[in-house]
């Protein structure tokens, strides 16, 4: 159905949402697309291969239940498949949803599709990763530059203010990839000019590819003091490379996101720490924003869903446990 006005119940994203546990990955979330008596919101994410997206889906489903709307939740097979994601976005548009949530793999490529949505009067909510467009009515996401700067701050604290480090980043086309790279690099340049960033590689968020890239970096730079992985797949790839080369305890690894593998790596001392987002909150706030847009409410241009640094010293704190996803 289209442009149905309905009231929005008050609701805040709390730790209870996350503590309820993550649903398994898959194609559709609640509902199947455009029921007769509920507004329909189509969500197109960046993928399903990481536990992060399963947690985003869970938050979206919780909001759908709370606000009595129907949603679908889809994403490409990998976070490198921009073409598949755009096909899914077109399919979502063809269903005539009341609103669309979109997490862009490429911040520029989706422009014509977003224009279709605007021309059809379909409000677009960007989530996790924004786009180079003013068409989305809001973006629900982590402040990725600030989060990456926080990761860099801890890198400096751990390796000192001199030496060589490197980055394995998930991509250089999405806003998240760009911001998590630039936020980290800019902090190092401004606050620790004695640290040299010897390499930045892009692994598409793929764990195996990131492992190979990290191994090549480590073999080319035996005096490396630290590596930063910018998302779940990148960070675990770095951990795997360190383990396979027998370099445990010889350099500092800092990650981004959560997931059981990173939690285990921190607990086991293979990773110094990581930034965790609030993925359930991202999914929840995306659906909530769509509901409010359909009800004619004015939304802020960004909805900051927050981030936290976690390591072995605070991983069991209730505040951290509430935003870790497994």
Task: Indicate residue ranges for each PLM-predicted region.
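A residue-level marker of the well-folded mature domains of exported/periplasmic proteins
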Residues: 2-8, 17, 22-326
């Amino acid at each position: 159905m289209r442009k149905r006005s309905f009231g929005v119940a008050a609701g805040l994203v709390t730790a209870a949402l996350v503590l309820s546990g993550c649903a398994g990955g898959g194609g559709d979330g609640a509902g199947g697309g455009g029921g007769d008596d509920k507004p329909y919101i189509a969500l197109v994410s960046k993928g399903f291969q990481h536990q992060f997206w399963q947690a985003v889906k869970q938050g979206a489903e919780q909001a759908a239940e709370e606000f009595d709307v129907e949603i679908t939740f889809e994403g490409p097979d990998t976070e490198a498949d921009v073409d598949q994601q755009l096909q899914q976005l077109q399919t979502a548009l063809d269903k005539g949803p009341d609103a669309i949530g979109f997490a862009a793999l490429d911040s520029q490529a989706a422009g014509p599709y977003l224009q279709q949505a605007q021309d059809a009067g379909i409000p677009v909510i960007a989530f996790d990763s924004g786009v180079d467009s003013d068409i989305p009515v809001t973006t629900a996401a982590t402040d990725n530059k600030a989060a990456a700067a926080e990761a860099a701050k801890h890198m400096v604290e751990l390796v000192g203010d001199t030496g060589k480090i490197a980055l394995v980043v998930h991509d250089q086309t999405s806003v998240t990839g760009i911001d998590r790279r630039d936020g980290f690099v800019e902090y190092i340049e401004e606050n620790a000019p004695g640290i040299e960033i010897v390499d930045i590689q892009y692994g598409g968020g793929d764990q195996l590819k990131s492992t190979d890239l990290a191994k090549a970096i480590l073999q080319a730079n035996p005096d490396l003091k630290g590596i930063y992985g910018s998302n779940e797949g990148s960070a675990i790839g770095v951990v795997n490379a360190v383990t396979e080369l027998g370099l445990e305890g010889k350099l500092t690894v800092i990650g981004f996101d959560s997931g059981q593998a990173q939690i285990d790596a921190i607990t086991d001392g293979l990773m110094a720490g990581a930034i965790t987002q609030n993925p359930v909150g991202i999914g929840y706030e995306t659906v909530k924003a769509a509901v409010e847009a359909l009800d004619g409410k004015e939304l802020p241009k960004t909805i900051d869903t927050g981030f936290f640094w976690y390591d072995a010293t605070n991983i069991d704190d209730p505040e951290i446990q509430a935003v870790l996803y497994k």
